[in-house]
Amino acid sequence: KKEKEQGCYEDFIECLKLYDKEENGTMLLAELQHALLALGENLDDEQVETLFADCMDPEDDEGFIPYSQFVQRLMSDPVVFD
């Protein structure tokens, strides 16, 4: 099970690195929101906002977030939608 979880984490990180233009472990919050709405699971805006509130620190002054921290929190404590 541990290998499967680690593989999923690494897969998520590799996908999000595509948005990491500065190659510093951050991406624009707006790009993460777009990726979540456009790819994978069918999430609506409200679900994405819930996900961000539960799994992420606020964005910095330029709109960037550290995506590895987001993925770690999401995988350690999945968000359940009502």
Swiss-Prot record:
Protein's GO biological process: mesoderm development
Keywords, comma-separated and alphabetical: Motor protein, Muscle protein, Myosin, Repeat
GO molecular function: calcium ion binding
Family annotation (SUPFAM superfamilies): EF-hand
Stretches assigned to the EF-hand domain: 7-42
Pfam families referenced in this protein's UniProt entry, alphabetically: EF-hand_7
Quaternary data: Myosin is a hexamer of 2 heavy chains and 4 light chains.
The protein, known as: Myosin light chain alkali
Organism: Drosophila yakuba
Gene designation per UniProt: Mlc1
